[in-house]
Amino acid sequence: MLFRSYREEYDACGCFEYYASGNGIGARVRDAVRANKAYKGKLRQKPICRISAYDVFSAYNEKDPIAISVLHKAVEMWGMASANLVSLLNPQKIIWGGGVFGPAGIFIDDIYKEACKWAQPLSIKQVEFVPSQLSGNAGLIGAAFLAIKNHLYE
């Protein structure tokens, strides 16, 4: 996996998870709100321990500086991760789905631009980034499919 030549902060949950998952996005914002006593933005209106990724996307839409900073970092990490996939596997399409990618679907073009900085140049020109048609229900639908498949073919 591609990494920058320096390390930012470390968290035992792992770099990608810390920056780019729904739980990680919420945790980074909670840390930032706690650390910035002067911050008076939208995310301060709720108990810090209850701030979720959903709140971060809502604050982003209202141009909250902490939400913007955290989500821009997530876009960078999603771009780097997808660049690794493109460079290693040379897919035709990357489908973005899951809980975070309901609201994060607005970033797909930005993720592609970030991936272009890191990916193998010929491969990245041949891949398409698209949102899942299943949105945040991909995991649920996949689990239902497996249950039905296993029940029918036992």
Predicted regions and their residues:
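ATP-binding/phosphotransfer module of carbohydrate and carboxylate kinases, centering on a glycine-rich
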Residues: 5-154
